[in-house]
Every structure is written in C-alpha cells, then in structure tokens.
C-alpha cells in the first residue's frame, strides 16, 4: 500500500481515538448537538478503522513469518511459508477494501429523498406500472425501516398513477435510491389486451435529495407565483369546500410544484416548498457536476434522467439493468421490493468507476 494512503489511515485512527475520548467527556455529553455529531463521526470511522487495524495485524503476521524463515528447522520454515502466503492474501484483500472505504463520500448520501414517478408513453398501462413501481419502492423502504410519505399524486383512470411524489426518510436513503433515476421500461400483456400481445410502456423516475433547512438555497418570495385550487384527491366532502391545494411556480427556472395531499393549505404549502427546494437544488447540483465532470461522466450515476436504465419483461420474468449489463430472472422478487439484487451491483460498479478515476488522477 502507498505510503500516502498509510499516513491517511494513521490520521483516521488517531482521530477515531480522539472522538472516542470526547464522547466520554461530560461537557460533550451535556451538549446534545455536539454529542450527536461526534457519534455520527465515530460511526463513519468505525469500518475504516477496523479494516486498518486488521491490515496492521496482517502486516505483523507477515513480518513474523519472514523471521521464521531464518529458522534451522525445515518444518518451521514450511509453516512460515504457509503463514506468509495467507498473510499476503489477507493484505491484498484488506487493501482493496480500504481503498473503497477511503473513496470520497457523497455528502448527500445520508439525506432523505423525494422519489418522483411519472407515467410516460403507454397510456393506462404506463400509469398502472407507475403504481407497481410505487409499490416496489414502498416495499423496499419497509424492508430498510424507512418511512414514506406521499407528497402529491395524480391517479390514473384505470389504476396506478399518472404522477406520484413520495418522500422517503431514514438512514442512507439517497445513497441507495439515487441510482433509480432514469427511464424504466415495462414489457407485458395488459389486462385489457384480448389478443395476448406484449405492449411496451415507459415510466420516468427522478430521485432528489431533501435539502435540510440549514442548507437550503435562498428562494426569493418575489420569484414565486402561488396559486390555490380545490383538491381533486381523496378527502371526502371537505375537499369541495376549501381551496386547500397549492401550486407554486418558480419563475426563474419554470419549475412547477403542486401539493394537494393534505387538508390544510399551510401543510400543502410547506410540502410544496420542500419539493421545490429539492428540485432547484438538483438543477444547481447538475450545473456543478457538469462543470466538474465535463471530461468524464460516471458510468452509473449519469445525470441524464431521460436515459433508459432498466427493462422489466414480464413474459420472461426478466429484469435487465442496462447501465451494467446485468440480467436477472427474478422479476417477481424485484417487484416485491428485493432491489438490493440490482442496487448493490450498481453501487459496486460506481465504486469501481471512482477507483479507476482516482488511479487516473494519481497516475
């Protein structure tokens, strides 16, 4: 391992010990904000510190085995050869692990996310599939103990959604779901199809990270056009009595957000503003990424949200993830929320791409 990497790991080990000592300090314990921040930092350091300690132990084992090679006893030398082989293999494995752990973290990965699902080409069938994707993400959220909240929805005439926006809250939400942005294509026989022909429909998914109030970009109220209207969603007779639904237009960007899920106009406005902030932030993030990565685009986390990323073929029970040429014949499991079968390989490919970029920079 490079000396510069070793020095970086030693610095993290030292910082880990400092944080551990601070967490036992009475003045820190009494300051809840600082205690939470340090607890989070300690948790983030845990894996890399454990990996480096294991690396140091494997290096010590290798050095010890090398000393044993000087022994006169042939049996001891043979044992030393075996121990050297095992220690070298372990060092190689740990070095790969540590390289991944040292990759720069996306600061947004721990944030909550807004998942926007919109029916595209395919009419009623596209809306029905948008509903299927909503259910798939809901099941995945449930498996990860995340919370979901519908921000707004426009139901399809024959089921599903023309559009639905959900907020997903929990640990590491955006870091996993960000890979879902893009075009999702479905191939299946619609229930209304009497000839048994396979139809192709499309749904677009956009995943945006939530912008915490402390980090929120400044939105000038003068740049907003706010309209109220009567909700068309569920809610009984109440929805016909008050203009509780909100439509906010951000004039400089043309971004429009509607929220009508809550009975209170105040709550709908607050939800609409949080979605608007996320969308404006996404535009700003994309501008920044484009400037930084004009010469190299990430294979997996492409900013092109219209790009077709996945195909769900129901007659064959097949899911094809086009970004990494992954094909799985377990469509039912995926639709029931087993998304890790796709997301983990995507994350690994993204890490490999980052490592390759890092090697290019160092080379």
Swiss-Prot record:
Keywords: Cytoplasm, Methylation, Protein biosynthesis. It comes from the Bacteria. GO terms for cellular component: cytoplasm. Residues 284-296 have a biased composition (Basic and acidic residues). Residues 284-305 are annotated as: Disordered. The modification N5-methylglutamine is found at residue 237. The keyword Hydrolase does not apply. It holds the Pfam family RF-1. GO terms for molecular function: translation release factor activity, codon specific. It is found in: Cytoplasm. SMART domains: PCRF (SM00937). Methylated by PrmC. Methylation increases the termination efficiency of RF1. InterPro entries: PCRF, Pep_chain_release_fac_I, Pep_chain_release_fac_I_sf, Prokaryotic/Mito_RF, RF-1. Its main location: cytoplasm. HAMAP family: Rel_fac_1. Peptide chain release factor 1 directs the termination of translation in response to the peptide chain termination codons UAG and UAA. Belongs to the prokaryotic/mitochondrial release factor family. NCBIfam families: prfA, PRK00591.1. This is Peptide chain release factor 1. The gene is prfA.
